[in-house]
């Protein structure tokens, strides 16, 4: 099976039992563990640790969709990933038995510096931002969007099409049926907001006064503060605040 590696990049370490199908593009410095299966079209960045028994690029769970023998044949999808496929960034840790499905109308996407624990799953057409943690057995339905710095606890289930806001903390065993607000703490079945993720905000470099100024916005009772937020956080929350109305 063939795979591409960026010229001049660090070598990839791929276990001999791993299967990489046609249309899999690798950056450099990736580790791919035993019995992992990656089928194209898939583009993976640099420095990822992909453990044993991981599956990336298998078909989306659509009963009427095609299920090709992609580990033997060249992919039938768009090799430019303009519509479907999988795109994974850099420096992610993807633990054993995790899975990422192909997209059907857009690429299923995982950003940079994420940690996917054992048995977590990213469904077709899902978008996961940067620095996201999916704990053991977290299941993301198709078309979901998890924004950067979110943390989903063990066994959380996210209904297809749901949105998890930036910096949100979702408690273990939660069933998310609709949108979860930015930097909220959410728990239960159905999941409901129970507070503000103060720890997450402090880790983003906010002092007590700035957290206090931002809290009304987090609770949906005020506007974003005009200043005081670090540039990267300001960009993130402004993008969330300006998301299309149908995502509210």
Predicted regions and their residues:
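Short, low-complexity, intrinsically disordered N-terminal peptides in bacterial proteins
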Residues: 1-11, 246-248
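Structural signal for interior beta-strand "rungs" in well-ordered beta-sheet cores
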Residues: 7-192
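Conserved beta-strand-loop-alpha-helix hinge in the C-terminal portion
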Residues: 184-206
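Interhelical loop and adjacent transmembrane-helix boundary motif
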Residues: 218-221
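Short, amphipathic C-terminal "tail helix"
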Residues: 227-248
């Amino acid at each position: 099976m063939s795979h591409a590696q960026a010229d001049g990049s660090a070598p990839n370490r791929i276990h001999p039992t791993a299967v990489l199908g046609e249309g899999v593009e690798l950056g450099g410095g990736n580790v791919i563990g035993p019995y992992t299966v990656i089928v194209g079209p898939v583009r993976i960045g640099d420095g990822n640790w992909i453990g044993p028994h991981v599956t990336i690029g298998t078909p989306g769970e659509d009963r009427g969709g095609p299920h090709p023998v992609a580990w033997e044949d060249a992919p039938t999808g768009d090799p430019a990933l303009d519509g479907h496929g999988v795109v994974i960034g850099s420096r992610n840790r993807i633990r054993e038995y995790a899975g990422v499905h192909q997209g059907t109308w857009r690429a299923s996407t995982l950003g940079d510096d994420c940690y996917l624990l054992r048995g977590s799953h990213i469904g077709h057409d899902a978008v996961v931002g940067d620095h996201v943690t999916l704990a053991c057995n977290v299941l993301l339905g198709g078309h979901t969007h998890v924004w950067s710095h979110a943390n989903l606890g063990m066994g959380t289930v996210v209904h297809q099409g749901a949105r998890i806001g930036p910096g949100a903390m979702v408690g273990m065993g939660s069933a998310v049926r609709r949108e979860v607000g930015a930097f909220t703490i959410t728990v239960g079945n159905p999941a409901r907001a129970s507070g503000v993720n103060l720890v997450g905000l402090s880790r983003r470099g906010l002092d007590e006064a700035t957290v206090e100024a931002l809290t009304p916005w987090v609770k949906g009772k005020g506007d974003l503060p005009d200043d005081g937020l670090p540039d990267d956080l300001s960009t993130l929350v402004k993008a969330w605040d300006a998301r299309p109305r149908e995502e509210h």
